[in-house]
Amino acid sequence: MITQEDHTTYPLGDGIGFVNLVTTMGDDLTTVNSARVSYGGMSEELTERDEKLIKYLAENKHTSPFRHAFMTFQVKAPEFVARQWYKHIVGASFTAPGDAISHGWNEISGRYVEYEPEFYTPKVLREQAESSKQASKESNTGLMRTAGTLLYCYTKESYNQYQKLLDMGVAKEQARMVLPFNTYTEFYWTASLQAVAHFCALRDHEHAQHEIREYAKALDEYASETFPVSFQYLKENL
């Protein structure tokens, strides 16, 4: 369980990548009252009747009331995870560390800052699945262990080349071109409750990549703690 005192999780277990719940706006009553405003109604406390209304809204795809509650996350993830995440910007807002903006995608810029030597290295490399172009399967073969060594060596060498380019005076915006896709990046994500539910439904799925699934699970736990009724019915009906 996540509490107010413990609002940071480390999805990949490497002590580098994280999801931090920065702030939230609204609660389950936000969904209820935004729906009832059509009739001039308002609830002060969440009742069983209100929960039935939330269930009805979700089951019948009346989704606009779920867009009035928001969550803001600070995320540190490998580039390949962030690029998948980018596809979910519809109905959400992204901003780099600092003041939030109302829309768009912003993250730490390699044009302005020098990248730290922070890279995601999986504990186990997976083999390509024969049944699907986008699926993978676990492997503990010697071949995969050799591939892991290759990945580690390439990552280390790419950062060395990055540093050499910077030392030669090459601009950061161009020197970064040698960095691999497992380089860590950082961004803020502000999203409606509906957008968070949609992200979790698609990315915490058996066909999704393992790494982004772990991030989706972290978001799921935060949303379930903050919006227990609304988020549960949204997930059941997406």
Pin down the residues of each PLM region.
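Family-specific signature for flavin-dependent thymidylate synthase
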Residues: M1-L238
